[in-house]
Amino acid sequence: MVFLHQTPSSSLMYEKLISLLPQYTSIAIDTPGFGMSDDIPGNPTIEDYGNYILEVLDNLEIEEFHLIGHHSGASIALYIENHYSKMIASLTLIGVFLATTEEKNLMKKQTGLDWSPKEDGSHLMNVWKLAGDILGAGEDLNLRQRETLDAIRAEVSAKQMHDAIWNFNEIEALRKTKAPSLILCSEDDVMYPFLNQAIECRSDAIVETIQGKNLEPDLDATNIAVLLMEFLKKI
């Protein structure tokens, strides 16, 4: 199993879920610019991120795998499936961004949370709010601290990734997918309003509502593990 994390998190977001899937060899990769991966310059695209992930898998000599992606990780997963479908045994997308170009342009104008360094330290409260209120860590201080630290580390990289996301067509990419697919999303996930597109794009996909706001793999890990195992038994 290969796991691709959301922005601005890191592969740490999958530790709980992976612990519930001991029967599988699981690999969670830090996307370039996140976690412990090196930064990359310029204006990388989703295609670039996908190719970096494939380079890692090639170095590990992994030729076939179940692919799981969350938010931006789901976008990268779609690119990988579209271009290297023979490698993908199954595709699981959590909170995939199935917005139209018009919807993305509107969201782009409304997305304004900034945690670039400020002399007065106010950016630290901004990122604390991001982790707790927006992502959904809430009163779980350990989770909130982890997500805060991941976000601070990825402050520049998050902007790169968001720019890449605005310019990638997840709807068209999902339509092109061939692998057996499981699509999950929490009702309070920021991507939930677009979930109806999943059925229109892939009527044969299994679509399930889960819990956990934007941190489902942490906050609804047991349920996701059950759904994932049931899904894999069917394919």
Task: Report each predicted region and the residues it spans.
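Conserved HGGG/HGGXW glycine-rich cap/lid loop of the alpha/beta-hydrolase fold
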Residues: 1-38
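Residue in the alpha/beta-hydrolase core beta-strand immediately N-terminal to the catalytic nucleophile
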Residues: 30, 66, 89-92
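Conserved acidic catalytic loop of the alpha/beta-hydrolase fold
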Residues: 47-65
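Gly/Ala-rich beta-loop-alpha elbow adjacent to hydrolase catalytic centers
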Residues: 69-77
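Flexible "cap/lid" loop of the alpha/beta hydrolase fold
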Residues: 78-82, 89-120
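Conserved alpha/beta-hydrolase catalytic His-Asp/Glu region
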Residues: 102-103, 118-175
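Conserved loop-alpha-helix segment in the C-terminal half of the alpha/beta-hydrolase fold
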Residues: 181-220
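Post-His helix in hydrolase/transferase enzymes
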Residues: 217-231
